[in-house]
Amino acid sequence: MILGVCVALGAIALTVYLYRKFFGALYYAAKIGGPPGYPLLGNALLFINKPPPEFFLTLQNTIQESGKCFRLWLGPELLIVVTDAKVAEAILSSPKYIEKSGEYDFLRPWLGDGLLTSSNRKWFANRKIITPTFHFKILEQFVEIFDQQSNIFVDQLLPKAETGECFDVFPLVTLCALDVICESAMGTTVNAQILSDSEYVRAVKEITYIIHLRTYDVMNRYNVLFSLSSYRRRQDKALKILHGYTNSVIQSRRQALAQRNSGKATVDGRPLTDEEIREEVDTFMFEGHDTTTSAISFLLYRLAKHPDIQRKVYDEIISVVGEDRTLPVNLSQLNEFHYLDLVIKETLRMYPSVPFFGRKITENSEIANITFPAGANIIIMPFFMGRDPDYFDDPLHFRPERFASEMSAEKSNPYRYVPFSAGPRNCIGQKFALAEIKSLTSKILRHYEILPPQQDQHQEESFIAEVILRPTHGIPIRLQKRQ
């Protein structure tokens, strides 16, 4: 009798809790507005079975129809899409909203509780430990790696320049960026540019593909369904290779890695475990190769389309480093590439490497006169903010000079231009990334002129917005060797 009463009371309490949680979210979400949905499915039918480019176009059309802040239901999952700079500022600038949204859970099998995916206390501790890694003195050492790997890259491009063929530069940049981040993060080389079909390189490609797949494939978003698919088995196989490689490096370089962390890295007064080191190294591996690949590739694409801008960048590079192509570029010289800096900023405005940032709302919150219900995933979209005429004049026109004036787009609209996120969870490696982009771009331009495809090979811009922004049809360019 007593047991029955306890069970009944427990069931009632659970029902009340679920009712308040779900129907409270329904109530506040209805006030936000968004496209009409269906019972149980919500808006999932908008996106089910759509390939990535169509998924992106559907999202773009929904933004145009629903405004700068609206809700989407993917089954029981509530997403609130934000392209309003004021709302983005309120969320990104506040230490209250540092928990990442559910989309980042797709990274956890590879990255564990690294800096990108961890929350609250662990994130604060990890951030404090890792920040010194990007001090400018250490960055100078990384620039040497950038230059060495860039030399290999321009050698790999030579056959393309000699034939004058049109080719997709994106996968080649990926291999170079992978070599850079492996040597920078682990102090070892995987020779991805030379051994592009090695087991490790294939595993990186496989795991990044699966992570990206889960961001747009509605059926694979949910762990129950994903665990039944062949992708789960493929993921496990790739992770065995990736974690095994990182663990072997840690074991062989334990002392060197400890010194790189000044020998004082602790969490709650204890040294980092091998697993914690692996999580941070793997986080660098993921964040450090895919994001820079996207940025460099779209930058090369724009330089090919705008020969006048390319010429100005080239002239600036030569004025700083001279005409001897064999001389390496140091950090001080990279910092003198002021016009190239403007071109990079304009590229990231139109093609942010990370097209969205996600945050989880842990309690009902009033933000910019909107009540965001607890449990909602907030998706902030810098891609669409960067192309919004309310925020940027003539936004589809590539004009680096918009960042040069005292009242530049970057300064007057700080949360309308957030390619590296902003606030307490901004990208810790942005100086590293910008230095790498400048180093590789300057090396390419010292050796080659970048040309667009022939007219009959031209394709309209089309994007895949996964964790990283990718071009649907690659980045086709041609090269001409400089005399």
Region locations from a protein language model:
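C-terminal helix/juxtamembrane-tail motif
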Residues: 2-4, 13, 468-483
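N-terminal membrane-proximal hinge/A-helix region immediately C-terminal to the signal-anchor transmembrane segment
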Residues: 2-121, 125, 140, 144-156, ...
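Cytochrome P450 heme-thiolate monooxygenase catalytic core
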Residues: 99-107, 118, 141-294, 312
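Cytochrome P450 heme-binding "Cys pocket" and the immediately downstream C-terminal segment
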Residues: 307-310, 430-468
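Conserved cytochrome P450 K-helix/beta-meander segment immediately N-terminal to the heme-binding cysteine loop
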Residues: 380-408
